[in-house]
Each structure stands twice: as C-alpha cells, then as structure tokens.
Amino acid sequence: GFEAMQRLNPRLIYLSISGFGPDGPEAGKRAYDPIIQAYSAMVSVQGLKRGEGPEQVNQLIMDKLTAHTGAQAIAAALYARERTGLGEHIQLSMLDTAVAFMWPDAGADVTLQGDVIEHRPPISAAGQLVSLADGWAAFMTLSDAEFAGLCRALNLDELQADPMFQTLTSRQRNRQAYSDRLSEVLLKTKSMTVDTFLAKLDAEQVPAASVKRLEDLHNDPQLIANEVF
C-alpha cells in the first residue's frame, strides 16, 4: 500500500480510485458506471427536463470523468511536490467525482434553502432541441440579447412581446409556460432545413448547432481542423 511504498520513496504520488470512497457505509461496495450515476442522483437530474422518471446518461460518463479528475489531481500533486519535495496519497471516488461535476449547476436549487428562495430548474433546462425538415438542431438562449436574437431570426414577435418572457428572470420564473410556448411556435420551423435554421440563428449570434451522428464525426470539418481525427 501507500504507507509501505512511501517509506521507500517519500516523493511518491499514489492515486487510489474507488466507487464510493475509503470510509462510510458504502465503502468497499462494488460499483460500475450506472451504479454511480444512480447513487449520485445523476439519473434523477437527467430525467428532470422531461418530467419523467430517472434516466441514465447513455455513456460511461463516470468512468471517463473519474479518469480525467484523477489526472488533474496527479498534476496538482506534481506541482505541490515541486514546492514541498513530498508526494501524497490521493483518495478519489467515482461518487465524489459525480457530485462535484454536477453541483455547480444542478445543485444550485438545493444549496440555497428557505421559504424566501425561489427554486428554479437547472440552467441546462434552457437548452432546446428542434426537429427540422432534414434533421435536428440544438440552441440555447440565456441572455436577453440572445432571446431577442432568436425572436428576430424566427419572426417570433408575439413571443418577444409577451411580458412573461421579456427578461431572463421572467423566463426562468415562467419556465414551464415558456418551454410550452416555445415548443408551440417552433412547430412552424419543421419545414426548414437544418442549414437554413442555423444560418438564421448564426446571423443573430444565437448559440446553435446541428445534431450530429457518431458516424459523421470523422468527416466533420471542425473536428478535422481541430486534428481530432
């Protein structure tokens, strides 16, 4: 273990990864990616937007995130060793990684407590998928400028004029009504091609992208420019 090896080399950096952590009632339990997704509430968060039951992320997301987090921890330990001359034992769990990954946005609603706090859906709920004539696209409007740009791009004058939706605060406060209304008005875009839809939103600086298929990625110009493939 670490203690024996550290006696041989005090500069040793040693990473231990577990499912649930070294202590506590779940310590030592076997864990796989879907198990951690469930225990960390990730599957509950994933199902929030549609208002349905828990839903797993269709990826081994926690295996990969834990590996990335471990690499970052080792890099930090290497930096610390340059200052102190000593190594350390890094204890990392998949569960801690999952909670830390979700908390900045998904955890906001349970961090602030009390009757005076206005609880809102996570910011990711502002994202929208839209079905078009030849595929799908995604867009997201957070700022009032982006919302105004969306309305100009798609001629959504009535939506923009509605006082329930004119500011980010009012759109968040009326999240369900906004989502329902937006889904309704977006029906008129179904005859648009993906390229036409994106061109309209790009012209107004509204963040948007086409929905890709895995088999398309190796020929994607942006990924080729990034030298991913």
Where are these regions (language model features)?
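Active-site-adjacent "lid/gating" segments in soluble enzymes
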Residues: G1-A137, T141-A145, G149-R152
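Short secondary-structure transition/capping segments
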Residues: A27-G28, R171-R175, D220-A225
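Short, surface-exposed loop/helix-turn segments at secondary-structure junctions
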Residues: A108-V116, L154, D162-P163, D220-F229
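Aromatic-enriched alpha-helical interface/lid elements that frame and gate functional surfaces
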Residues: A126-E204, A208
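A glycine-rich dinucleotide-binding beta-alpha-beta segment and adjacent secondary-structure elements
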Residues: A203-F229
